[in-house]
Each structure stands twice: as C-alpha cells, then as structure tokens.
C-alpha cells in the first residue's frame, strides 16, 4: 500500500469512528464537507497520518484495521510532503 493510499484508508478509518471524527475536525479545523476536496492534496494526507500517529492507541487500532505494521504507517507519513520539497509522488 502506497503512502497516499494508506492516508486515504486512514481518513476512512477516522470518518467511520464516531469518537475520532469530531476530534480530527476539531484539531485540524477543517469542516466535514471540505474533506473530500482536501483529500486530493498530499499535504493534507500527511496531516491525516500525523493525526493517526500522534495517539498510540489510534495508531495501533488503525494499523490492525489496515493489516499493516505501525512502522509502515510512520513510513507512509514520512513519504508524504510536510512542508518540504523532498516529496516524491512515486514513493
């Protein structure tokens, strides 16, 4: 699973959880109706994974749900742009 695909899966995981979604919206300041457009931006997707990895129980739950190791989530997060020019869309 590529970095963007993992971030989109994480976004779905967040959206499906009635406790996580309000927390995500509050922390990011994004409105629910704006998520679809924002999800087209690799920087937003990096933020989704940052949200997941910032809370270990959420990271573990997502990794189990996605069938990946928690380290793979961290690797995907690092592969997405985070305000630098080193982003490689093919990673």
Predicted segments — roles?
Residues 1-91:
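Metal- and O2-centered redox machinery and metal/ROS homeostasis
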